[in-house]
Amino acid sequence: MTYLQESSRPAVTVPKLQAMREAGEKIAMLTCYDASFAALLDRANVDVQLIGDSLGNVLQGQTTTLPVTLDDIAYHTACVARAQPRALIVADLPFGTYGTPADAFASAVKLMRAGAQMVKFEGGEWLAETVRFLVERAVPVCAHVGLTPQSVHAFGGFKVQGKTEAGAAQLLRDARAVEEAGAQLIVLEAVPTLVAAEVTRELSIPTIGIGAGAECSGQVLVLHDMLGVFPGKRPRFVKDFMQGQPSIFAAVEAYVRAVKDGSFPGPEHSF
C-alpha cells in the first residue's frame, strides 16, 4: 500500500513551522489517535498530528471533551509516537489538568514522556503565566483561542467567537498575550475570517485555523470529520474529503493539497 512506503522528507520541528510561516507555506494539521493512522497521515505529508481531546467525541462517544483524562491523552500520544512520524506530534492538555502553572507542567511532562513534542491548551490572557512557565522549562506550547470546546458550558454552546467589536478586540489581546508569553503556535477556532486574518497579520507565530478562514498560516480538522465519519449535523467548517476518493489515503492527500494550495477552506467553510 502506498502509505506504507518510506518517506524521505525531513522531520517537522517547531522551528520548521516558523520557517514555513515565513516562507508562506501553509501548514496541514490533522488529529490522530493511533499508530496506523499516524503512519498513513505521515505518508500523506501531514505536517502536524494532534492528539486532541476530540477523542472524547469521536472515539469515546462523549457529547463534550470534558470527560477526557490525562491518561487518555497519554495513551493515544504513545500510540501515535510509536509510528515514529516525521510530523510534529502535539498533544492536548485535557480539562482540569492545567489550572496552575505547576499543574500544567506536570501534565505536560507526562505527555512529553509519552511522545508529544508540543502541548496545546485552551485559553488566552489568563493563561499567559502558564505559557511562560512551560516555555521556560523547555515545553513547546500551542495556544488555542476563539471557540474553546472545554468552555462549552460557559459559552452556552458551540458558538462563533469574536463576532462583536469587543469580542474581536479581546481575541486579539488573547493571541498577543500568549505569543508574548512564548507560545510558538496558536489555533483559532470558529472565528470570523476577517478577525482571524487580522490576528494572523498581527502575530509573528503561525496561526492554525478551524472555521477561521483561509488567511491563517495553516488548517486543522478532526480526522473523522474530514473522512465523513461524524454523527448528526456536519459542522460548517468541515469538508468531507472522502467524497470522490478511492481510499482514506487519497482523501488525506487531497486535504493536504487543498490546504497547501489555499483552496480549503472556502467561504462556505468559514464565518
Curated annotation (Swiss-Prot):
One of its GO terms (cellular component) is cytoplasm. Signal peptide: none annotated. Binds 1 Mg(2+) ion per subunit. GO terms for molecular function: 3-methyl-2-oxobutanoate hydroxymethyltransferase activity; magnesium ion binding. Its EC number is 2.1.2.11. Gene3D superfamilies: Phosphoenolpyruvate-binding domains. It is found in: Cytoplasm. Keywords: Cytoplasm, Magnesium, Metal-binding, Pantothenate biosynthesis, Transferase. It catalyses: 3-methyl-2-oxobutanoate + (6R)-5,10-methylene-5,6,7,8-tetrahydrofolate + H2O = 2-dehydropantoate + (6S)-5,6,7,8-tetrahydrofolate. CDD domains: KPHMT-like. InterPro entries: Pantoate_hydroxy_MeTrfase, Pyrv/PenolPyrv_kinase-like_dom, Pyrv_kinase-like_dom_sf. It is an enzyme of class 2 (transferase). Pathway: Cofactor biosynthesis; (R)-pantothenate biosynthesis; (R)-pantoate from 3-methyl-2-oxobutanoate: step 1/2. 3-methyl-2-oxobutanoate binds at residues 53-54, 92, 120. One of its GO terms (biological process) is pantothenate biosynthetic process. Pfam families: Pantoate_transf. Its cofactor is Mg(2+). Mg(2+) binds at residues 53, 92, 122. Catalyzes the reversible reaction in which hydroxymethyl group from 5,10-methylenetetrahydrofolate is transferred onto alpha-ketoisovalerate to form ketopantoate. NCBIfam families: panB, PRK00311.1. Belongs to the PanB family. Homodecamer; pentamer of dimers. This is 3-methyl-2-oxobutanoate hydroxymethyltransferase. It comes from Burkholderia thailandensis (strain ATCC 700388 / DSM 13276 / CCUG 48851 / CIP 106301 / E264).
